[in-house]
Amino acid sequence: MSSLKIKLVKGRAGKDKRQLATLDALDLTRKDKVVIKPDNPQIRGMIRTVHHLVEWEEIDS
């Protein structure tokens, strides 16, 4: 099963509540933090919501 490596590359300041809630759900609490999440439609949807704030890539786990 593959996973996604997600990194917050832009700060959280000035973002709307929906974007902040999505970043919290992804556990991206500060700039340059990296998390590994399972590759599923829910996580992909969260990435789509904050695509302009994060970088992500697929990894094999």
Swiss-Prot record:
Record keywords: Ribosomal protein included? yes
Kindly give the InterPro entries that the UniProt entry links to this protein.
Ribo_uL30_ferredoxin-like_sf (IPR036919), Ribosomal_uL30_bac-type (IPR005996), Ribosomal_uL30_ferredoxin-like (IPR016082)
Q: Name one GO molecular function term.
A: structural constituent of ribosome
Can you quote a single GO CC term?
large ribosomal subunit
Record flagged with keyword Ribonucleoprotein: yes
One GO BP annotation here? translation
Keyword set, alphabetical order: Ribonucleoprotein, Ribosomal protein
Q: Name one Pfam family in it.
A: Ribosomal_L30
Subunit arrangement?
Part of the 50S ribosomal subunit.
Show the HAMAP family listed in the entry.
Ribosomal_uL30_B
The family classification in the record reads: Belongs to the universal ribosomal protein uL30 family.
Name this protein carries in UniProt: Large ribosomal subunit protein uL30
| Species the sequence originates in | Petrotoga mobilis (strain DSM 10674 / SJ95)
The organism that produces this protein has a lineage beginning with: Bacteria, Thermotogati, Thermotogota, Thermotogae, Petrotogales
